[in-house]
């Protein structure tokens, strides 16, 4: 089964998960932020360099909070929590920030499955499955 359920950090309330990215016979493991406001998944320059990618001439437009920018992209395999794999993902670069994630898991991956973030009895839980096994309908629960 390609799914996982993990607890969120109670201090940040941010949906962080462990992410492994593979390319060029190398692997990088770090924290990724599940970001529904991010159209495409992305990695930091640090991860790009660790994976042995050269600077890319291939770019495309990315729409950010700061406006439209041209960003390079690369192809990687991504493994999420519980060994959930997504292969040959076109991933963008983003500028890292202090204590920030190494990855953004964007709608390009999220939209391939079902995502639920729930808060019950004070515990915040992230659940994800890929591919989707059906609709989550809170009105029918």
What label would you give each PLM region?
Residues 1-141:
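Pepsin/retropepsin-fold aspartyl endopeptidases
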């Amino acid at each position: 089964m390609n799914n996982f359920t993990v607890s969120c950090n109670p201090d940040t309330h941010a949906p962080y998960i462990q992410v492994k990215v593979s390319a060029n016979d190398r692997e990088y493991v770090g924290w990724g932020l599940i970001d529904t406001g991010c159209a495409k998944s992305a990695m930091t320059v640090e991860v790009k360099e660790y994976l042995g990618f050269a600077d890319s001439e291939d770019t495309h437009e990315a729409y950010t909070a700061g406006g439209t920018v041209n960003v390079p992209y690369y192809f990687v395999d991504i493994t999420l929590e519980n060994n959930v794999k997504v292969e040959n993902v076109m991933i963008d670069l983003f500028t890292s920030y202090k204590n920030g994630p190494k990855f953004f898991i964007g709608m390009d991956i999220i939209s391939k499955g079902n995502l639920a973030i729930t808060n019950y009895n004070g515990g915040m839980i992230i659940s994800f499955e890929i591919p989707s096994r059906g609709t989550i309908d809170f009105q029918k629960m």
